[in-house]
Amino acid sequence: MKELFATTARGFEELLKLELSSLGATECQVAQGGVHFMADDETQYRALLWSRLSSRILLPIVKTKIYSDLDLYSAVVRQNWLAYFDERVRFLVDFNGTNREIRHTQFGAMRVKDGIVDYFERNGKARPNVDKDYPDIRIHAYLNRDDLVLSLDLSGEALHLRGYREDSGAAPLRETLAAAIVLRSGWKQGTPLVDPMCGSGTLLIEAAQMEAKIAPQLHRMHWGFDFWRGHNQAAWEKVKREAVAMAEAEFNKNPNPHFYGFDLDHRVLQKAQRNAQNAGVAHLIKWKQGDVAALKNPTPEDKGTVICNPPYGERLGTTPALIALYSVFGQRLKEQFPGWNASIFSSEQGLLDCLRMRSHRQFKAKNGPLDCIQKNYQISDRTLSPENKSAVENAGEFKPNANVATDFANRLQKNIKKIEKWAKQEGIEAYRLYDADLPDYNLAVDHYGDHIVVQEYAAPKNIDENKARQRLLDAVTATLAVTGVETNKLILKVRQKQKGANQYEKLANKGEYFYVNEYGAKLWVNLTDYLDTGLFLDHRLTRRMVGQMAKGKDFLNLFAYTGSATVHAALGGAKSTTTVDMSNTYLNWAEQNLILNEADGKQHKLIQADCLQWLANCAQQFDLIFVDPPTFSNSKRMEDSWDVQRDHIKLMGNLKRILRPNGTIVFSNNKRGFKMDFEGLTRLGLKAEEISAKTLPLDFERNKQIHNCWIVEFV
C-alpha cells in the first residue's frame, strides 16, 4: 500500500473522495485542493484510469521543512532519485507555492532541478535533460509556508485532457469540471439527458461515457509512470484489460440513444460530433441544430434532466442578449419539460434569476478564474393551460416576459406612446424614453434609431448591491418586452460620476458608429465604446436654437464635445465656425460630423486645446458663442481646476473680450442649483436671461434640472 494524493478543483474534494472510495481507495482524507488516500498497485492504476474528477495523481516522495533555498536544494539532492528513474529520462519540475525565502515559483523549480541533476552527477551518472514540452517524468513540488512536498506525478499530462476533444467552441468546460457538473446534476443513468446549448458537447460526452462505462483515460497513450522504476506493468495491464472488457460489454448492449445536444452554431455541432466519435459515444448522442427559443422536448413521454452551461459574460455590456437568452430558456424549460429536473451552471446569479425558477439545491465551483454556481431545479409537473399549450406547439422567436417589473414596464409603455409620436413629428431619431421616473428603477432608457441604450445610474451606498442588480436585469427584460428591440441592439451601461478624464476612457473598442437625424442634421453616435454616446439629448432644442441664430455669423463652439452644435450652426448658414475641445477623440468625431453634413470647408476650423487657455489667448472676434463647460474639472491636461459656479464670471469676462458688440453668448451647464452671478455680470457690462425652460424638450420635461441655459449679451 502506498500513500497518494489526487488533486482537483477547489470545491470538488468531497465528490472526489466518494469517487476514489468507489474505486477501492482507503483512508481517504480531504485536504484543500485534493484528497489523500491509500492504494495498492491495482487501485493506484484504477484511480488513474477511471477518475473523472482528478486533475493529477501524485506519489509523495519527500515531506520536509525548508527555510531557505539551500534547505530546498539539500532536501532534493539528498533524495535517492535513481530509485524512481534513471539518467536517460527527460524531466520537468512543476513548482507551486512560496514562502519568505522562496518567493518565485520559477526560482523554486530551478533549485529543485539543480538538486536532481547534481544528485545524478554525484552518483557518477550523466545529467538528465529537462524537457518542458514532452517530459518522461514530472516532479511536482508544493511549498506551503515552510512545508515542502516533492511528488512524482503519475499522470503525466493533466487528467482533464481525455484525448477526445480535437477542438471546441469559444468557452469550453474542462472535462473534469463537466464531469462534476453531471455528477452534481441529479441525473440518473438510463434516463434522458438534454443539453440545449451544448457547444462542443463536453457535458453530454462525459455523461455518456459514465453510462457506457468507458474509463475517461482508456485511450491515453502516455503516462507519468511509463519511465518510473516502481511501475508494475502486470497490474497496469490487468486494470486496463478490465476497463476494455467493461466498455465492450456495454457497447454490445446497444442501448437506444437518450442523450440530446442542441446548439445554434452548426460548426460547433460538427466539432461535438467528432468529439463524441473520438470518445466512443457517438452512438448514444443525437445532435440537432436549433435555437433555444424554439427548443422542444425530444422525449416528452419520458422524464429526465436538462443540463446546461449557457453563455455568461463578465462585462455588463454583454448582458442584454444574455438576459433575453436566460429569460426564454426559463420559459421553454417550464413549457417543454414539466416534471423534469434541470441543472444550470453559470457565473451570473442575476442571469440565473432570469430563469424565473426556484432551485432546491446549489453548488459553488470555479471555471478558470470565474466564481460560478450550479443550480438544480425541479420543474413543476402542473398541467399547462390552453394558452401555454399553444405557445409550446408554436415555438418561435423570443418574446420577453412582460410580467417582469410591471410598474417599470407600464411607465415605459406610457412614455413611449407619448414621446414617439412627438419625435416623429419633430424629425428626431434620438430621444429619452425613461429617466429614473420610479425610485426603484434608477436608470435611463434612450432611443437611438433602431437601438436602445439602458444606462444604470450608480446605486446609493445604502442600496443592497444584489437587489439593485436584480432590478436592473428586470428592467432590461421589461425594456426588451415593451420596445420589441432586437437583443443585440440593446446596449447596457453603468453610469457613475465622472472623475478626471475618465469620460474619455474607452469602455470597448468596437468602432460601431451610425448616424441619427436631428432637425435636418445628421450626427454620428457610438453607443458602445464610451460612457457617453456622442450626443447630449437634453441639449437638442439648444442646438436647434443655435442653428436658427447662426445665419451670416462667425460662430464659436467652446468645450465643443463632438461638435453637434457646430453642425447645426453650419447648416443654419454660419459665415464661419470655430470648434474647440481638449480631446482629440471628440474633435475627430466633430470633423466626421461636419463631413457627414457636407460642411467641411476652410471656414470651419477645429482646434485641439485647453479651452480656457485658448480663450485667454484668443484675438478673434465672434458674433455667436455657444459654451457648455463641465461642472467641475481637475484634468491633468488643464493648467488649473475648474468649477462652473466659482469660475463662470471669469469665463464671461474672457468671452466678452472676443464678443462683437451685437453678439450673443449661449451659456449652459449641468450643475444642479447653479446660481448666476448677476452682480458680476453687471460689473462686466453684461446681462443674462435664463431660457432653461425653453430649451427643455418634451422627453426631458420630467427632469427640469438636467441643465440650465442662458442668453448673455451686452447691456
UniProtKB/Swiss-Prot annotation:
PROSITE patterns: THUMP, UPF0020. It holds the Pfam family RlmL_1st. SMART domains: THUMP. It is an enzyme of class 2 (transferase). Its EC number is 2.1.1.173, 2.1.1.264. One of its GO terms (molecular function) is RNA binding. CDD domains: AdoMet_MTases, THUMP_AdoMetMT. GO terms for cellular component: cytoplasm. It comes from the Bacteria. InterPro entries: 23SrRNA_methyltr_KL, DNA_methylase_N6_adenine_CS, RlmKL-like_Mtase, RlmKL-like_Mtase_CS, RlmL_1st, SAM-dep_methyl-trfase, SAM-dependent_MTases_sf, THUMP_dom. Keywords: Cytoplasm, Methyltransferase, RNA-binding, rRNA processing, S-adenosyl-L-methionine, Transferase. Specifically methylates the guanine in position 2445 (m2G2445) and the guanine in position 2069 (m7G2069) of 23S rRNA. NCBIfam families: PRK11783.1 (NF008748). This is Ribosomal RNA large subunit methyltransferase K/L. It comes from Mannheimia succiniciproducens (strain KCTC 0769BP / MBEL55E).
